[in-house]
Amino acid sequence: MSSVTVSIDPHVHSVASYDGHEPVELILEHAAEIGLDAVVITDHDTMGASRRAEAIAGEYGLIGIPGVEVSTAHGHLLALGVDRMPPRRAAYADTIQWIHDRGGVAIVPHPFQRSRHGVRRRDVPLSDGVDRSTGDEGGQGSPAPDAIEVFNAWLFTGYRNRRARRFATSYDFPGVAASDAHHLQYVGRAFTEVRIDGRASVERVTAEDVLTAIQSGTTRVDGRRAPVRMAARHYLTAAEEKSRYYAVRGAVRGVTATVAGTKAAATLGRVGFAQGLHRTRRALSWFR
């Protein structure tokens, strides 16, 4: 059987993320220049830029795959191959099930790193019914993720990556590598090679082929970590940008609520005035 290997960076942020900086066109152009076959835009809780990247990826000779990094109740989760935004703040297992119901692939990003909203080890669902908090077997099991991000380029040391790899190996999860890039020069710094069986050339590979191959585990990880100095700078600026983003978002919501409250008060005032006028007229009618 013929097969072909494609290189994919499944975790990249665009300017649509609160901590991203690059438009999708530049990301796609750069990905093509460095030899990637696909790059998935996985912005935080928004899919507009990712859907655009999917639509125009072919113009750069790339495979278009939509995605998003969704905030669940237990941590971040990558949803690849979905065409709409998953519900936010839902349970991890419920979000995985939502992704599967729509033909997507669920990948655990930067697992166990709580400072980056990574899921705790005990909250990663298994499909074999094992309760890792007690070690008990024979349970119903939960919808399990399709893969674990075992190499993330934005880690200070290799400890978290090694821990993620051990976890994936222990529970037979496929592993992927990703740059988690927020700046153009880091796109593709870590990537995943995916073997696609039954295809003779990259040009014939579809998004569905890539997602199916990830699920089947025909993956190999490659890449290198970002420099420690740049990683430290990224964490500091990302925290500031996140705070600024939510401060602006909160201010907008506050203004919206104030305007809505003012309008409601004005409406109630008009209603009260009309009711009072009506009662006055009725009272005066007794003296006619």
Where are these regions (language model features)?
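A glycine-rich, hydrophobic loop/mini-helix early in the fold
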Residues: 66, 70-72
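Short acidic, glycine/proline-enriched helix-loop-strand junctions
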Residues: 51-64
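A broadly used, surface-exposed interaction patch
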Residues: 91-93
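Charged catalytic cores and adjacent phosphate/nucleic-acid-binding surfaces used
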Residues: 1-10, 14-17, 24, 29, ...
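Divalent metal-dependent hydrolysis catalytic cores, especially in the metallo-beta-lactamase
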Residues: 27-45, 104-107, 145
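Active-site flanking residues adjacent to catalytic metal/cofactor-binding acidic residues
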Residues: 10, 42, 68, 109, ...
